[in-house]
Regions:
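Structured non-transmembrane domains adjacent to transmembrane bundles in polytopic membrane proteins
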Residues: 1-138, 286
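Alpha-helical membrane-protein architecture signal
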Residues: 70, 74, 78, 107, ...
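Hydrophobic, glycine/alanine-rich multi-pass transmembrane helices and their short helix-loop junctions
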Residues: 95, 99-101, 197-254
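Membrane-water interface of transmembrane alpha-helices in multipass transporters/channels
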Residues: 105-115, 134-156, 216-231, 244
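Short helical (or helix-break) motifs at transmembrane helix termini and adjacent helical loops
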Residues: 158-178, 200
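Helix-loop junctions and hydrophobic alpha-helical segments within the transmembrane domains
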Residues: 179-201
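Interfacial helix-loop-helix hairpins and adjacent transmembrane helices
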Residues: 242-287
Length: 287
């Protein structure tokens, strides 16, 4: 086994063996040239687990062999998040679709909301790879280029989806209220954006400032989280919510509120209660 392992590219030095007190267990340690995030080291772990260990111990009864260490642990964590990411996305997207479908009694609005949220998330992921994996701004931000930590995309996706969906529902609620009062969709969009723009901008500015502080810290993982969330909120608040959302609402017009006939049984839901227009000042009494 040692000959085959040491023959792999990236291995260095002879192994060290330690036996347990009862002589039933042995720990054999090998040294690899790269760090735990080195892709070559992950390939070595995969090959040892897939080929070398089964070929060496597979025919021996009552013998268990395990491959551990920093590189093996990192590989297991990466594989865990890779397997779980589709399930997380399916749950978040599916639940968001159902809630928006019931809230706005439209099948177009939830589809459009999910696509817009995925757009801002994808843009954030692209910038994250450009800066941290490709090394752009590495000197300015004070880090060494390397792979994105495996849990960072999952955290960014879930946190950003919650924040952006909150902004989205806030805007759409005001648009729907204006439309329910009889305004055409185009005018309702303009009124909804005018009412919510100040609140959305202020909330986004606060979140961007908070996340940007994370980028100044020394830990690369925190830098990645802060940068990804700050850029995502910036894109979401300035481009997606302020430009793409109202543009698509005006282009689709009344199609925004289309609901198939077989879903007309859905209940009417009021998200934030009825908000009436300000009442007129009472006129002074006259004799």
């Amino acid at each position: 086994m040692s000959k085959r392992i040491l023959a792999l590219e990236g291995m260095s030095g002879p192994p060290q063996t330690r036996m347990s007190v009862d002589g039933k267990d042995a720990l054999v340690s090998y040294v690899m040239a790269g760090g735990r995030n080195d892709e070559r080291n992950r390939d070595i772990v995969r090959e040892v687990r897939r080929d070398i260990v089964p070929a060496t111990f597979g025919a021996l009864p009552d013998v268990n062999a395990y491959v551990t260490g920093d590189a093996a642990f990192t590989l297991d964590v990466v594989d865990f998040y890779a397997r779980g990411m589709p399930q997380v996305m399916a749950f978040v997207l599916g639940l968001s679709f159902l809630l928006l479908l019931v809230a706005f009694r439209s099948i177009v609005i939830p589809i459009k909301a999910i696509l817009l949220n995925l757009l801002s998330t994808g843009a954030a992921f692209g910038l994250l790879v450009l800066v941290f994996q490709d090394g752009r701004l590495a000197d300015q931000l004070g880090f060494k280029a390397g792979p994105i930590e495996s849990f960072v995309p999952v955290f960014i996706f879930t946190i950003l989806f919650g924040l952006s969906m909150d902004y989205h529902v806030f805007i759409l609620t005001r648009i729907k209220e204006a439309r329910d009062r009889g305004l055409p969709t185009g005018e309702a969009v303009a009124r909804g954006i005018a009412i919510t723009s100040g609140t959305i901008t202020s909330a986004a500015a606060i979140m961007i400032t908070v996340f940007a502080v994370f980028v100044t810290l020394d830990l690369v993982i925190i830098k990645q989280l802060g940068f990804g969330l700050a850029t995502a909120v910036l894109i979401d608040a300035t481009i997606v919510r302020s430009m793409l959302l109202p543009a698509t609402m005006r282009l689709l017009g009344e199609w925004n509120w289309w609901l198939p006939s077989f879903l007309r049984w859905l209940p009417e839901v009021t998200i934030e209660g009825d908000i009436d227009e300000p009442a007129a000042e009472p006129a002074p009494a006259t004799a």
